[in-house]
Regions:
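N-terminal beta1-alpha1-beta2 module of alpha/beta enzyme domains
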Residues: 1-62
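Flexible, glycine-rich active-site loops centered on histidine and acidic residues
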Residues: 2-12, 77-140
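Conserved beta-strand positions in the central sheet of alpha/beta enzyme cores
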Residues: 33, 67, 99-101
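Glycine-rich, histidine-containing beta strand-loop boundary motifs that form or position
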Residues: 36, 70-72, 102-106
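Short, small-residue-enriched loops and turns at beta-alpha junctions
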Residues: 40-41, 75-77
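Residues at helix-coil transition
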Residues: 61-64, 95
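Conserved catalytic cysteine-centered active-site region
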Residues: 63-71
């Protein structure tokens, strides 16, 4: 059985995320995930949410064995070509340890819809968002 750890980054400090990653690796966890969100829907203010890909790249430099990935990356937030390049780069930086979790993002009914609005993107219907995931997979 493989066991992974999810680090919830909402209002987290990098040094705490780093310590958790090192502890997870020392404890024998197989993988480590962090959310790829732009904001904490439950916080009106605070330090914000660390950007997932930047954190994962930094964690790749301090860990040696544990797999790393975003859980899950909303394909609407990045062009699939940019995402493919990001994934290839992180795969190289980690020495093959990238776990790529991708998804369609939340519907208009979720608090995460505000992330697309902040980027100037509309929150599309479920079937359109699902199709965009398939398109991103095909491109990658």
């Amino acid at each position: 059985m493989k066991t992974d750890l999810l680090i919830i980054p909402m209002s987290a400090r990098y040094r705490d995320m780093r310590a958790a990653a090192l502890a997870a690796e020392d404890a024998g966890f197989d993988g480590l995930w962090t959310w790829d969100h732009l904001r904490d829907p439950d916080a009106e203010s605070g330090p914000g949410v660390p950007e997932a890909w930047t954190v994962l790249t930094a964690l790749a430099e301090v860990t040696r064995r544990i797999a790393l990935g975003p859980l899950v990356l909303n394909v609407a937030n990045r062009h699939p070509g940019v995402l493919a390049n990001m994934a290839a780069t992180l795969q190289a930086v980690t020495g093959g340890r990238l776990l790529l979790g991708i998804g369609a993002g939340g519907s208009r009914r979720t608090p995460y819809a505000a992330e697309q609005q902040a980027l100037g993107l509309s929150v599309e219907r479920d079937e359109i968002r699902a199709r965009r995931v398939v398109e991103a997979i095909e491109l990658m």
